[in-house]
Swiss-Prot record:
Protein name per its UniProtKB record: Coproporphyrin III ferrochelatase
GO biological process: heme biosynthetic process
Amino acids binding Fe(2+): 211, 305
SUPFAM superfamilies: Chelatase (SSF53800)
Organism: Tropheryma whipplei (strain Twist)
Enzyme Commission code(s) on record: 4.99.1.9
Amino acid sequence: MIRRSAVSRVVAEGSAIASDSGFALGASQYDAVVLLSFGGPEGPEDVVPFLKKVTSGRGVPDERLYEVAEHYNHFSGISPINDCNRRLRGALEKELFSRGIRIPVLWANRNWQPQLEEVLREAYDRGFRAFLTLFTSAYSCYSSCRQYREDIAHAVERAGLSGRIIVDKLRQFFDHPGFVLPFIEGIQDCLEQVKERGFKVSRTAILFSTHSIPELDAAFSGPEDAHFGKYGAYVSQHKAVVEVIMSRLRVTDPDLQNYQLVYQSRSGDPSTPWLEPDINDAIRVLRGCEAVLIVPLGFISDHMEVLWDLDNESMQTARECGLFAIRTPTPGTHPLYISGMVDLIVERLEGVPRSARPAMTDLGPWFDVCQPGCCKNSRSGFKPAYGGVAP
């Protein structure tokens, strides 16, 4: 039996109306949590098919595709994101069980095995009817939220489960303490290493790196009627978190003044404007610095964009510029991060009101339910999506 809370859930665009406030009203019951991620190849034979699936219709040149394939081949064709998600799934379930919450955590991907439609179908056959999804992306934009929601709608339809199950989503957690505090801790630890090596904090640059996206996607990120500036909620959320982190760091290190938000891992049509500056360009123009501290602020785990684009390419750029470089850890399975993500789940299970939800910036806490037009696709137009208010 499908169990509903005080708010009517949106099971697809156009099928139901949710809370006008964007926040779920009242407690909800779920049969499982779904950790929903991007996916990645599990062996050399998977690499090119995976990349072609991911880049289909995006105008990515073949030479770029095969360049990225070589990155995976350095890891024997296995994406590190898979083991990261296996560990994350296990840690989340363990934390839930430790709190007496007997809800299983399932792992599913948008672009590779285990495919979401298969996971939902198998869960349905086990008697599960209500699902709460946790996306492995903290911020708001098409590729990190709306596309997940569209893929849920597509997976439910392909699984033949339309109208039979409920799939809700957790809020974006960019400013939740469980996500932000591990970064602060990691930066503080790395700054100690910088000092131990004899470098001055006043001559250390901190580069907060996140995934670049097309400028138009950035402009459309967030609620349609919000006013976040030229690059939308995506950039505003990142900048707000950066300022919170820096304000904490300068309490003990007031000489920390050189920092900026940078971007990485762009792809797609080379003629399409993407967010800049690229991290490598930013490193090359640093002046008066001895060291650079790289913070992967846009990522929750050590997947390919972190291990290759940062640990390989950006570190090499720093060496070429004569700079000492160090990268902070991603949240991964940090206890604060795991506890924070379970707190998000509890918010929905217990119906925690917005006023009682933690957020470290003035932008949060973010919405449970997306509004019409939120993070719309600038290229392919409207598609049905779960977890949003019907237009």
